[in-house]
Amino acid sequence: MTKVYFIAGETSGDFIGGRIIQNLKSNKGVEFTGIGGKCMEEAGNFKSLFPITCINLMGFVEILPHIFNLKKLIDKTVQDIINSQADLLITIDSPGFTYRVAKQLRKLLPKLKMIHIVAPSVWAYKDGRAVKYAKIYDCLFALLPFEPPYFTKVGLDCRYIGHPIMEQEFYSDKIALREEFKIDKNERVLCVTLGSRQGEIRKHLPVFISSIEEIFKSCNNLKVIFTLANPAHEAIIKPFLEDVQFHYLFSSARLKAYAVADAALAKSGTNTLEIVASGTPMVVAYQVNLISFFIIRLLIKIKYVTLINIIAGSEIIPEFIQFNCRASLISNTLQELLFNSKKAYKQVIESQKILQTLGLKSNRSPSYIAAEIIKQEFLESKIKLLKENST
């Protein structure tokens, strides 16, 4: 039996892992194990070592209360990989956790083949992660077409596979969606997306809700859809909404929510690309602990946080980061998008032009490309040997 050990630490990584498992599971004699979420568990006979929420953390100061528990989980994961006698380790994003696991294993199991999916954003930071990854991993799968040269020049085999949003089903029939969400003709719809990390949800809710309340003062026909990366997040959000006047609902069908909305208020992340692909204008807002912010400012070498803006070199999508993450600023810009169709249309068109330049259209899905590389270059010889021994 060929054993593949996956580690995914957040919702986006779980989606990627799940699709790769779906593409690999037709190969008899391959067993999947590791750490993942719902998508990976539903894709095959996969049971996670522990819930991914345990390692779904971000920031510098923010992770300090969890540092000892994270160390225990890293050690537990390393030992589980050793005990499983895995033939291949595939880590997906979550570099704060996955890199530390891989680094330990490179010393303990020098012959273990290791692949990392989602290249670290070395083009955005003043750091030496390309060299660090080259010392640990055998291969790196990049989601963006311009990323491989940053790694190949330091000796790491890096392949462009495409972005997972290529595998999403996007919706365009707003009339049908409005009926599905029971939205009246005269209602304006704002979609709010807070991400998958509980700490970030709690951090952003007060300013997001204040922004919505400002809009509601002049737009009492506003309906708000809070998207849920995890159904359990509804219990986190609800207490913040006890005294609000605006109408709201929750939805786990985030792509439908993005498509039905007239505008979106989004935390920075992969969700912004999905909102662009859904044809909805948005405002991006984000804040972290003050110490974390100043550390990031020392490391970062880019002006924007949203990928569309980074590629464009200009602020196509309005960003309100840290000290500018204020209800007065956010609400004014959102109202312009909700009620100024020219501004909204301009943002959507310009954003989608940038999206197309990322090479996000292909006849083959990223998970299929990734699975073929894994199968042909990392698993085929072992599978063939097992077949020969069984005959």
Swiss-Prot record:
Keyword tags: Glycosyltransferase, Lipid A biosynthesis, Lipid biosynthesis, Lipid metabolism, Transferase
Top-level enzyme category: transferase
Record's keyword annotation contains ATP-binding: no
Entry's EC annotation: 2.4.1.182
GO function terms (MF aspect): lipid-A-disaccharide synthase activity; phospholipid binding
Record's function text: Condensation of UDP-2,3-diacylglucosamine and 2,3-diacylglucosamine-1-phosphate to form lipid A disaccharide, a precursor of lipid A, a phosphorylated glycolipid that anchors the lipopolysaccharide to the outer membrane of the cell.
Alphabetized InterPro entries for the sequence: Glyco_trans_19
Pfam families: LpxB
Family: Belongs to the LpxB family.
Catalysed reactions, semicolon-separated: a lipid X + a UDP-2-N,3-O-bis[(3R)-3-hydroxyacyl]-alpha-D-glucosamine = a lipid A disaccharide + UDP + H(+)
Biochemical pathway: Bacterial outer membrane biogenesis; LPS lipid A biosynthesis
Name this polypeptide is given: Lipid-A-disaccharide synthase
Biological process annotations from GO: lipid A biosynthetic process
Any one GO cellular component localisation term in the record: membrane
Disulfide bonds: none
